UniProtKB/Swiss-Prot annotation:
Its EC number is 7.1.1.-. The gene is ndhD. The lineage of its organism: Bacteria, Bacillati, Cyanobacteriota, Cyanophyceae, Gloeobacterales. It comes from the Bacteria. GO terms for cellular component: plasma membrane. It comes from Gloeobacter violaceus (strain ATCC 29082 / PCC 7421). Belongs to the complex I subunit 4 family. The chain crosses the membrane at residues 5-25, 32-52, 87-107, 111-131, 133-153, 165-185, 211-231, 239-259, 273-293, 302-320, 331-351, 371-393, 414-434. This is NAD(P)H-quinone oxidoreductase chain 4. One of its GO terms (molecular function) is NADH dehydrogenase (ubiquinone) activity.
Length: 526
């Protein structure tokens, strides 16, 4: 049903229109202007979902459809369901805090805040649009601000990192365009509308090819090994606000699109690729955790930690269970908060120590007790300490994988065993990182004691704002799971039903899927 007030259109266009006015704002006031726009946009998001969104309805709500180019089926189509609504709220929340983190930027501040506002519009658009062409356009729109913010405000290797980022993501985006056009021309109905595309009956070979194409595209963004190498380079050169947007929101676009399109459009192909997603998730978790051990650069260490944590999203999606799919969604939300907080603290620490090399740090805890306490709390969240959001998300993925009836006992046991090994690695490298940064003796040859100023109120506010939902989700996850559960449960159920009507899995996967699932004797969910 068409929504009466165009909430999502206003939410998308507000930061874009406001960005056009940035050149008119005095340079000293532009940071206040940018923060105010992001705050107003976030308030509009909360108001829209509080007043016009039914949590029990799993379908698209706040829908708007306006003809754009009817000759070829293009339209402005936006909407939100349980997959997109939490991520839209996460985008508004983290972007508002990222603009606050950008206050110390003195090089071309107008241009920087212009790009931040444009990026907000692009990121919200990715989660809200219901048209493949619009999705592609917004997916591309958010690439340009990130490239410029890396290339202009990054570190010494910024041009290499920015070029690598744009090449990887642009090539990945081409697969989205090709698959979108292929679906448009498939069958008699010419449409780019996602709901109508999902309703088409694609033959198995077409589904498999399209699933693979989109998987490559989103493997870059998530990222998935071996298409992950742009992320450590980008994080290694980015400033704190860009870190927060990269870790907090951009990586989630890959996970969101994987669920929305790969699973939603091609459920029969999901049967073939679900075990691959699980294996790739295990590789992400263990490979990135082991690689993080060897990183002496603090930013790159946290970047590989992010790659490791996103592996749980792949396992949750591949589990073909309601609990696992819900765990994947919660892991994206949780990591968005934790990743943004950790990278902000990395930036705050670098501003004081002027080094990212762990061997050059040490002994700064007595001089910066607030930063030490906040860094410790956020690291505990990252290693999935009980009572914090990371624990609940990873637990749901484990339970979903262990209890799903889709896979054989042997396969489930191996997955849980390897994933548990990755979980054990996480506290080892995070706790050793804390020891190298804050304990020991101060390296006076590199770090100047007079620069070690403790956290200012702005920095405390940013981290406190992120820790509140981290603890809130950890202590009472139902507040968050209720936002998406009806949609993820329905999506998983429909996927299982479509798989049940399709051909049995190939003989190659005979030892992976359970006998009951392969024989189609039951399709019930656990």
């Amino acid at each position: 049903m068409q929504n009466m007030f165009p909430w999502l259109t206003v939410i998308i266009l507000l930061p874009l229109v406001a960005a056009l006015a940035v050149p008119l704002i005095p340079e000293k006031q532009v940071k206040w202007y940018s923060f105010a726009v992001c705050l107003v946009d976030f308030v509009l998001m909360v108001a829209a979902f509080f007043t016009s969104y039914d949590l029990s309805n799993p379908d698209i709500q706040l829908a708007e459809r306006y003809r754009w180019m009817p000759q070829i089926g293009l339209e402005w189509s936006v909407g939100a369901d349980g997959l997109s609504m939490p991520l839209i709220l996460l985008t508004g929340f983290i972007t508002a805090l990222a603009t606050l983190a950008a206050w110390p930027v003195t090089l071309r501040p107008r241009m920087f805040h212009f790009l931040m506002l444009a990026m907000l519009a692009g990121m919200v658009g990715v989660f809200a649009v219901q048209d493949m062409v619009l999705f592609f356009l917004f997916f591309e729109l958010e690439l340009v601000p990130v490239y410029l913010m890396l290339a202009i405000w990054g570190g010494k290797g910024r041009l290499y990192a920015a070029t690598k980022f744009i090449l990887y993501t642009a090539v990945g985006s081409l697969f989205i365009l090709v698959v979108g056009l292929a679906m448009y021309f498939y069958g008699d109905l010419r449409t780019f509308n996602m709901v109508e595309l999902a309703a088409k009956n694609y033959d198995p070979t077409f589904q498999n090819l399209c699933f693979l194409g989109l998987l490559i595209a989103y493997a870059v963004k998530l990222p998935i090994f071996p298409l992950h190498t742009w992320l450590p380079d980008a994080h290694g050169e980015a400033t704190a606000p860009v870190h927060m947007l990269l870790a907090g929101i951009l990586l989630k676009m890959g996970g969101y699109a994987l669920i929305r399109m790969n699973v939603g459009f091609f459920p029969e192909a999901t049967q073939l690729f679900a075990p691959l997603l699980i294996v790739l998730g295990i590789v992400n978790i263990i490979y990135a955790a082991l690689t993080s051990f060897g990183q002496r650069n603090l930013k790159r260490k946290i970047a590989y930690s992010s790659i490791s944590h996103m592996g749980f999203v792949l396992i949750g999606v591949g589990s073909l269970s309601e609990i696992g799919m819900g765990g994947a969604m919660l892991q994206m939300i949780s990591h968005g908060l934790i990743g943004a907080s950790l990278f902000f603290l990395v930036g705050a620490t670098y501003d004081r120590t002027h080094t990212l090399i762990l061997s050059e740090m040490g002994g700064i805890a007595p001089k910066m007790p607030k930063i030490f306490a906040m860094f410790t709390a956020c690291s505990m969240a990252s290693l999935a300490l009980p009572g914090m959001s990371g624990f609940v998300a990873e637990l749901m993925v484990f339970v979903g994988m262990a209890t799903t009836d889709a896979y054989s006992f042997q396969f489930k046991a191996l997955v849980v065993l390897f994933a548990a090994f990755g979980v054990i690695l996480t506290p080892i490298y995070l706790l050793s990182m804390l020891r190298e940064i804050f304990y020991g003796t101060l390296n006076h040859a590199v770090v100047h004691e007079e620069d070690l100023v403790d956290a200012e109120p702005r920095e405390v506010f940013i981290i406190a704002s992120l820790l509140v939902p981290i603890f809130g989700i950890g202590l009472y996850p139902k507040l968050t799971t209720d936002l998406y559960a009806p949609t993820t449960d329905q999506l998983t159920r429909v996927t299982r039903e479509r798989i049940a009507r399709a051909a049995p899995p190939p003989a190659l996967l005979s030892g992976v899927y359970s006998v009951e699932f392969a024989d189609r004797d039951r399709v019930s969910l656990r």
